[in-house]
Amino acid sequence: MTQDTSTYYVWIGGSCDYGHKERAGGAAVVIEHNGNIISRDVISDLHTTEFRMMQTLMLKVMQEIPEGSDILFLTNAAYIQNFDKTPTAKSAESRGRKARANPDLIIQCIEEKKRHNSVGVKIVQYHKSPLLIETHDRATEAMAKTRKEFHQKNNRLSVSSEIVASVSMPPCAQEGEDGTENSSHLSR
């Protein structure tokens, strides 16, 4: 692909682990300008999807790139092509589905797009785009890290709760050496 030196090319990919109950989602970008990689970014969160994370990161990129710029997002996720289409009940009906997901982010993207000369999305082939592959790999790593930190934090909280419960247990509720409840202090 021949690049225009004035355009910001933003490779964007995402990942989500639908198989886990805490469902982590992540997105990453690699930004090229004037033939050079100028920035990389990655985000992740729990109880979300890769699409929400990708739209969140699109919004962040549009906010950070200088006003009046030309921005082209390059991805294999057709979902984000509608980042600037106002969600309506009629658009949902015509597709026989519920209303478009993430309307809050779409509205913000529409507003942020106004700051720039042009903002578009181009679908590219995943296996032919090393920088797109990188974004998916980085999004997957960030998502896995977020999930791991969540479980480590919950395990620490669980252990802390058990320690507090055993330390604060009144003597009458503690067991004696023979396994029966020790209530000798009550008979005094």
Feature names for model-found ranges:
Residues S15-K21, D41, M58-H136:
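RNase H catalytic domain
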Residues S44-E50, E67-G68, I107-E112, N155-I163:
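Low-complexity, flexible helical/coil segments
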Residues E50-Q55, N102:
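Short, charged, low-complexity patches
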Residues M53, L57, L131-M143, E149:
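Stable alpha-helical structural segments in soluble proteins, enriched in small hydrophobic residues
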Residues K128-I133, R156-M169:
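Amphipathic alpha-helical surface "interface" segments used
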